[in-house]
Amino acid sequence: MIKWPWKTHQPQAETLAQWQDALAIPLLSPLDEREQQRLIVVAGQILQQKSIVPLQGLVLTSQMQARIALLFALPVLELGAECLDGFNEILLYPSPFVVEDEWQDDFGLVHSGPVVQSGQSWEQGPIVLNWQDVQDSFDLSGFNLVIHEAVHKLDMRNGGSATGIPPIPLRDIAAWEHDLHAAMENLQDEIDMVGEEAASMDAYAATDPAECFAVLSEYFFSAPELLANRFPVMYQHFSRFYKQDPLARLQRLQAENSAEVP
């Protein structure tokens, strides 16, 4: 049983039973009891500080709120909820949504038009999510929309725009930047060889450093074995930055499950 970790300022998901139910997803199963209790505390703080606004008739339940908060809390488990202080609202669509956007093609021409988005993280505004993809973020699959958008906010704390370099010690910036760009180039080489669909990781990581940081962070938390094998140096960078070791957690859980098999 997870003990209720505070006595006052109870978050919107009001009961311990609701938190325990919200925790029951594969992504969070490797966390030990101390980490789960800490995660609930951070998630509760996030629910106190942020408003989750359902759009297009979506009915928002307490379990949905709790699970969204837990996913936001995971990357800042050891950093603290204050690291996500750059926004006040989480806008939640039922499914991927259409926005007007501008983009530049390979020839430098700028185009504009409707684009389907899964999520957005505005520099001085809300995070936008969709519930369909949030639900797909519950597994240990390498995909996590909430972590992706939360990481953009962490990235923006280092100067106001997402560059792929979060607030880290000055002495570590050169190595981080070098290794992140090396990972992008390595992934692009793989994409050129086998195509986007057959690539070992989401091709979106090769588009720019900010997206590479966000996408690889998804793997760090939800497919740590793949990231540690594919880009071990980036795994170590992330482990130091987030102050977490998801691979060790997963291996511990796997060992416990193996020990239970007769």
Swiss-Prot record:
GO molecular function, one term: metallopeptidase activity
Compartments where located: Cytoplasm
GO process annotations (BP): proteolysis
UniProt superkingdom: Bacteria
Cellular-component GO terms for this entry: cytosol
Entry binding sites for Zn(2+): 111, 148, 152, 211
Transcription regulation in keyword set: no
Oligomer status and interactors: Interacts with Mlc.
Organism: Serratia proteamaculans (strain 568)
Gene: mtfA
Record's keyword terms, sorted: Aminopeptidase, Cytoplasm, Hydrolase, Metal-binding, Metalloprotease, Protease, Zinc
Listed name of the protein: Mlc titration factor A
Binding note for cofactor: Binds 1 zinc ion per subunit.
Pfam families: Peptidase_M90
Main location: cytoplasm
UniProt key word Endoplasmic reticulum: no
Entry function: Involved in the modulation of the activity of the glucose-phosphotransferase system (glucose-PTS). Interacts with the transcriptional repressor Mlc, preventing its interaction with DNA and leading to the modulation of expression of genes regulated by Mlc, including ptsG, which encodes the PTS system glucose-specific EIICB component. Shows zinc-dependent metallopeptidase activity.
Similarity field: Belongs to the MtfA family.
Cofactors that this protein relies on: Zn(2+)
NCBIfam families per record: PRK15410.1 (NF011939)
EC numbers, comma separated: 3.4.11.-
